[in-house]
Amino acid sequence: QKLTGDLATGKAGLEGLTALAGATTTKLEDMFAAAGNVGNALGEVGAEFKTPEEKAKAVLEVMKGVAAFGQEGAVEISDLAKQMAKVSAAAGFFEGDRSGNLLKMTALAQLARQSGGAASATQAATSVLSFANILRTPARRAQFKEAGIDVDSATQKGQLRDPISIIKEALTKTGGAIEPMKKLFANVMGDKPVTALATAYNKAGGGDAGMKAVDAMLAKFGGTMSDSQIASNNAERMKGTAAQG
């Protein structure tokens, strides 16, 4: 937890993060750096969290989700861990639950890499930060307003609406047509997560069928890596190490 200076949280989360790093063959330093970025995004002990243990548990839950998404998507956690600063920064602009937003941004990064045209984990993470910045740029905001789409939170001043809701509304309002979508998300990097969902929407024929395809795509990124799977992966790894030794 060198990035947060939160030693107590780092100590409380050490065992869980070490096990997760082993189970996903992620370098410890990358796992801890990623967890530090997630911890920064989630909040502070004494404010959002009562104890270091409570914060450490919340950080681990997010990281287990990120690991599970790595199994479903195109970017493994060992690669994405190095990019969590960008994903965490993007998550901070949206309304609602911080943990949930981190996982939504991670899912969008996975989709950007899988079928949105992002060529690497670095590009995928950059694309979600660019996506958040699109929604904060005056020229783009004017385009959304013109299309009848409100990108601002109705309940949290200064925050953006749920990112998935914004994309879905854009697809509905434009019918998924390429030109109107490009007009809204006019950023060659930031439109990559949107492109992945728009492609699924259009392939299914748009409308209700298209939205079902979008929901099915997003549903893949709803799980977590269970404690039993982490233990099993580590046991297999230890067996392999013993056999080699």
What residue spans do the PLM features occupy?
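Feature targets compositionally biased, intrinsically disordered low-complexity regions
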Residues: 157, 175, 209, 221-222, ...
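Short amphipathic alpha-helical surface micro-motifs
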Residues: 108-111, 178, 213, 220, ...
